[in-house]
Amino acid sequence: MSAKPTTLYDKIWNDHLVHEAEDGTCLLYIDRHLVHEVTSPQAFEGLRTAGRKVHAPEKTLAVVDHNVPTTDRSKPNPDPESAEQIAALAENARDFGITYYNEFDKRQGVVHVIGPEQGFTLPGTTIVCGDSHTSTHGAFGALAHGIGTSEVEHVLATQTLIQKKAKNMRVTVDGQLPDGVTAKDVILAIIGEIGTAGGTGYVLEYAGDAIRSLSMEGRMTVCNMSIEGGARAGLIAPDERAYEFLKGRPLAPKGAAWDAALRYWDTLRSDDGAHFDHELKLDAAALPPIVTWGTSPEDVISVTGRVPNPADIADEAKRLSKERALAYMGLTPGTKITDIKIDRMFIGSCTNGRIEDLRAAAKVAEGKTVNANVNAIIVPGSGLVKEQAEAEGLDKIFIKAGFEWREPGCSMCLAMNPDKLAPEERCASTSNRNFEGRQGFKGRTHLVSPAMAAAAAIAGHFVDIRDWH
């Protein structure tokens, strides 16, 4: 009798299941643990108090990213609390024997950029981090998701995690993406379709021609924002594109171990006939460049559209929520998206801070000048991304056009470091969240692709990137 068809999520889950209790609570083995300075101090302190060691330091990688300044690092950190957290991570990594990339190491960067870059992220592995955007690593066919600080301590101590199994959802995007439409637009469109709660209780598997055609950078962008759709994690089955990206990376398998890994990785795809609890299909050809207008990632609209009118929403709670969003964003229903002016622009983050993103922005910026009323910063996702961009001359293009070229870090994605919006400043951002106060107190965030962000910085307002050239 042939085995029951199985989803990719089920395969990875079953390979890592240590124990399942009668109530469905499971103990899962964790292959990789990424650590940063914000969610780890209490976890390490818990280990010290209990007299425990890190169970598998070789499967743990630490990096500073959230609090680190992206300007001159030869000067002291201006925020004492941030400086304390950075110093604590360095001390904890040293005391517990964990590999650590500090702010002066060229391998340093945003945790979800450096994992794949180093080959620490591998197909078929379970990966956790005290950060919600750990779902990024699902682009390689890894089961990856964020955990809380108490869970960080549990994984450090045991290399296992207690959780319940999620349901399966498949999101299929078929067809070819039009010019000017990117992976960022794909995931924003998906979130707009299912809402920020639509993926709750699910692991999303992305499939279809449009997904397969994406670069690894693009796939990481899609999986990165799975959490904004409410999902536990996002997955894309690994293929030759993933293998090519990983081959030769410092921490990837070598020689016979690589060949053995490939044989296993080739099994990591959902079987024909595997059951999904929910299916969603999108037509890639119908997708436009997208701009968010509100304070939730589900508040999406085509760049050619107008700010919607909440009065058209029948559900009272949702209507009031969208009215509040418009008031916070300082927008009027019916306003053309291309008439919305910006004050700031941010290209970077674990969503869009990779070399492909910087190349796309440089293509838009070359020979142009940033609008006099806009402050625009570009923050590479890692020191190695920065090094590669500079080798390609992208930094010169940006600086000549009037963009600020920064050091790697989380930067303006979140208001935990000096890169913040002032109250009521409006930002075109390539990050992943547009919540109230996310980029600074009363700051106004519009989520867009790197090319759309660069074009807005130059024009001073949102423009349809399809008309740019």
From Swiss-Prot:
Pfam families referenced in this protein's UniProt entry, alphabetically: Aconitase
One Gene Ontology MF term: metal ion binding
Domain of life: Bacteria
Gene3D superfamilies reported for this sequence: Aconitase, domain 3 (3.30.499.10)
Example GO BP: L-leucine biosynthetic process
Keywords assigned by UniProt, alphabetized: 4Fe-4S, Amino-acid biosynthesis, Branched-chain amino acid biosynthesis, Iron, Iron-sulfur, Leucine biosynthesis, Lyase, Metal-binding
Lyase listed as a keyword: yes
Pathway: Amino-acid biosynthesis; L-leucine biosynthesis; L-leucine from 3-methyl-2-oxobutanoate: step 2/4
Catalytic activity: (2R,3S)-3-isopropylmalate = (2S)-2-isopropylmalate
Cofactor names: [4Fe-4S] cluster
Chain sites annotated for binding [4Fe-4S] cluster: 350, 410, 413
SUPFAM superfamilies, per the entry: Aconitase iron-sulfur domain
EC supergroup of this enzyme: lyase
Disulfide bonds: none
Family: Belongs to the aconitase/IPM isomerase family. LeuC type 1 subfamily.
NCBIfam families noted in UniProt: leuC, PRK05478.1, PRK12466.1
Description of how the protein assembles with itself and partners: Heterodimer of LeuC and LeuD.
Protein name per the record: 3-isopropylmalate dehydratase large subunit
Organism: Rhodopseudomonas palustris (strain ATCC BAA-98 / CGA009)
Upper lineage: Bacteria, Pseudomonadati, Pseudomonadota, Alphaproteobacteria, Hyphomicrobiales
Gene name in the database record: leuC
